[in-house]
Design a protein with these regions (language model features):
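Beta-loop-alpha module in the N-terminal Rossmann-like domain of NAD(P)-dependent dehydrogenases
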Residues: 47-109
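Rossmann-fold dehydrogenase core element
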Residues: 105-122, 143-147
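C-terminal helix-rich "cap/oligomerization" subdomain common to oxidoreductases
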Residues: 1-3, 8-9, 36, 66-69, ...
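A short helix->loop->beta-strand "cap" motif at the edges of active sites that frequently abuts
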Residues: 86-88, 113-115, 218-219
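Predominantly a Rossmann-like dinucleotide-binding segment in NAD(P)-dependent oxidoreductases
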Residues: 123-203
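Contiguous beta-strand/loop segments that form the cofactor/metal-binding neighborhood of enzyme cores
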Residues: 173, 179-257, 297-309
Length: 343
């Protein structure tokens, strides 16, 4: 199997090191040629032995197959446009852009050149989310009429101050994962109601409690994400309600203690089906635990399969276009969420 020659562009995104680690851990799949545009002092030792290039050198490198773009939400779409124009396969960390129009331009290039393209939405590969989606497709849940999801954490003041650079703050930062889940199950909404606000904690004005209500003719999705929630990580939850069954995923993912291999996470779901005649006023669900899984590896392996021509896009490009518009609307914006004066 021919190795995929790939380069890392930027290291700003929170998942940059983890995704880069996957590339380095699988030399049978990826040949990391080097790095570009790294922020000095950020995880410096992890990239110390990598060859450094400037952008033009990589754009001119005929043998380069792909790039992993981790240059930050307001920058990544512009970097991606350049490499797409050069015909390189693209893995971009979520959500792919802070500007809808620029994102559309990128996807136009990807579509015209038929380039491999992937985004870092981790829940797309979560085994219990995938199970719920399979159950929906099989009709086991009946008609899905509601998705409720929470994805919270306790961030320090520096991170919460950083949120000020984006309209919608946490809705943009982590809420994009939840919006992706909701739109996967329900399609795209007729109306989006932004629900994010600033708690004012520590005197900051950033939108540190994000949220949105996605409204449909006969369904809705309520999504919430907080940067100040005590024990927020452990309370992350996705609930899919259908007329014939409910899937409650909690925890959505948690680390298996003392396991150092890639497959070091588990997800748990409680599944309740009407056909099993569950009691009306008592517990009737059956709890299932996933097999151990890796958070980042499946995304990059699917990307590699795209490059080899073995698989297609995880989601259609038209879905990705509409998803970006929905995320930006949930942030209370029309086209752009980046606020440069707040940097």
């Amino acid at each position: 199997m021919k190795k995929i020659k790939i380069a890392l562009i930027g290291n700003v995104h929170d998942h940059a090191l983890a995704n880069f680690g996957v590339l380095k851990s699988h030399p049978e799949v990826f040949d990391v040629v080097g790095v570009c545009n790294l922020v000095p002092g950020k995880d410096e030792s992890s990239y110390a032995n990598e060859k450094t290039f400037n952008m033009q050198q990589l754009l001119d490198m005929d043998e380069l197959d792909a790039v992993l773009i981790e240059s930050g939400k307001e920058n990544e779409v512009y970097d991606a446009q350049k490499f797409a124009a050069a015909g390189k396969a693209l893995f971009i960390d979520k959500p792919g852009s802070s500007n809808c129009d620029e994102y559309d331009k990128l996807l136009d290039i990807v579509q015209n050149k038929q380039l491999p393209f992937a985004l870092g939405y981790v829940y797309r590969f979560n085994p219990m989310v995938q199970k719920a989606l399979e159950m929906q497709k099989n009709g086991e849940l009946g008609t899905v009429y509601s998705v409720e999801a929470q994805m919270s954490v306790r961030h320090d003041m520096q991170k919460r101050r950083w949120l000020m650079r984006y309209k919608g703050g946490m809705t943009f930062f982590l809420g994009c994962h939840l919006i992706d889940v909701a739109c996967t199950f329900l399609g795209f909404p007729n109306k989006v109601l932004p629900l994010g606000f600033s708690s004012g904690h520590d005197g900051l004005t950033s939108c540190d409690v994000g949220g949105a209500l996605l409204m449909y003719d006969h369904a809705q999705a309520y999504l919430r994400t907080s940067a100040i929630e005590v024990n927020g990580y452990a309370r992350r939850q996705i609930v899919i309600n259908g007329t014939a069954g409910t899937v409650e995923i909690q925890p959505v993912e948690y680390h298996i203690k003392n396991v150092k291999c890639e497959d070091n996470m588990l997800a748990v779901a409680k599944i309740t089906l009407q056909k099993d005649n569950p009691p009306q006023w008592d517990e009737g669900g059956k709890t299932q635990e996933s097999q151990p899984f890796a958070r980042y590896t499946p995304m990059l392996m699917q990307f590699a399969a795209q490059i080899r021509g073995e698989e297609g896009y995880v989601r259609p490009l038209e879905y990705e276009r509409k998803l970006m518009r929905t995320i930006v609307a949930a942030c209370g914006a029309d086209n752009e969420v980046f606020i440069p004066e707040n940097v």
